[in-house]
């Protein structure tokens, strides 16, 4: 699917109502996909004013990476098969399809504007973090230790030698860039710990145990859209979580630790991390 394939007839078909005219605008900075905001003109009030389309990147290398990691397949299948079984806020999916033979895909999603994407470099407020961990509980809680998830073969799992080998390759690819960027900001002890981890990936992956749930796999501020509070007077923003290219079946604590460790500035994390974990646990408790 490319922008040239988007026509009024195609949009009318997938949205279930006549589209008389449309406009397109490239949005976001996706590395392995392309995002378009499509403005719609229709005589049918059931047709939204705009939608967001996700489709493959025009870059062949990005397409190959996405195919190897099953990103396109997993994102489409998350929206079609998993999204309705969990409570986390996601854009409504009007249409989704993925073609196994070509790895082509398209998603037609609710346009969440004027919600604003988070910034993992700038960090977030405490209220933003509270809303994010509650949304995480809404992802994990509904299918906590659900045995039927073992039958969902397209969910990412870091188990088995093949998965461990993939993790090792990714480590070798990305660690040099990490070291070049952050070495000067880390103590010798911290950097040594990070450097040594590469030799112990297999042990780390093999020893993880405990409850399992649906996981996001990349739960960071850049993948969250922040909007007005759901309830009037609430300090907590409405959060919509996007970029479901890495959904998995694994330890839910990984999503939580990744967000708390990377979402807040260090001084804020040190002060509030325990209360955020406690709030997450409270959110989980509502699911039994």
Could you describe each region identified by the protein language model?
Residues 21-27, 94-96, 196, 202-203:
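Short amphipathic beta-strand and strand-loop transition segments with alternating hydrophobic
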Residues 28, 32-41, 45-167, 252-253, ...:
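Conserved ATP-binding subdomain of kinase catalytic cores across diverse folds
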Residues 27-42, 52, 198-252:
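Active-site acidic catalytic loop and adjacent metal/ATP-binding pocket
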Residues 115-216, 226-237:
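ATP-dependent phospho-/nucleotidyl transfer catalytic cores
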């Amino acid at each position: 699917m490319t922008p040239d394939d988007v026509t009024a007839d195609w949009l009318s078909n997938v949205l279930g109502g006549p589209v008389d005219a449309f406009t397109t605008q490239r949005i976001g900075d996706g590395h392995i996909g392309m995002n378009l905001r499509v403005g719609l003109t229709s005589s049918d009030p059931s047709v939204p004013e705009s939608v967001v389309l996700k489709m493959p990147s025009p870059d062949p290398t990005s397409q190959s990476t996405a195919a190897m990691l099953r990103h396109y397949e997993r994102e489409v299948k998350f929206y079609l098969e998993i999204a309705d079984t969990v409570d986390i806020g996601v854009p409504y999916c009007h249409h989704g399809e993925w073609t196994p033979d070509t790895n082509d895909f398209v998603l037609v999603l609710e346009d969440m504007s004027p919600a604003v994407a988070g910034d993992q470099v700038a960090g977030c407020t405490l209220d933003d973090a509270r809303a994010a961990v509650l949304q995480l509980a809404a992802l994990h809680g509904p299918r906590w230790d659900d045995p039927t998830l073992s039958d969902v073969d397209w969910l990412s799992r870091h188990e088995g030698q093949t998965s461990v080998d993939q993790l090792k390759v990714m480590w070798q690819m990305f660690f040099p860039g990490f070291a070049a960027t952050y070495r000067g900001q880390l103590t010798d002890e911290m950097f040594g710990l990070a450097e040594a981890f590469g030799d112990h990936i297999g042990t780390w992956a093999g020893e993880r145990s405990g409850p399992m749930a649906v996981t996001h796999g990349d739960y960071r501020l850049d993948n969250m859209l922040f909007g007005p509070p759901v309830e009037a007077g609430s300090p907590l923003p409405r959060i919509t979580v996007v970029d479901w290219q890495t959904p998995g079946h694994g330890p839910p604590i990984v999503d939580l630790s990744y967000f708390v460790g990377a979402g807040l500035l260090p001084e804020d994390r040190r002060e509030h991390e325990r209360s955020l974990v406690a709030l997450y646990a409270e959110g989980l408790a509502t699911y039994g």
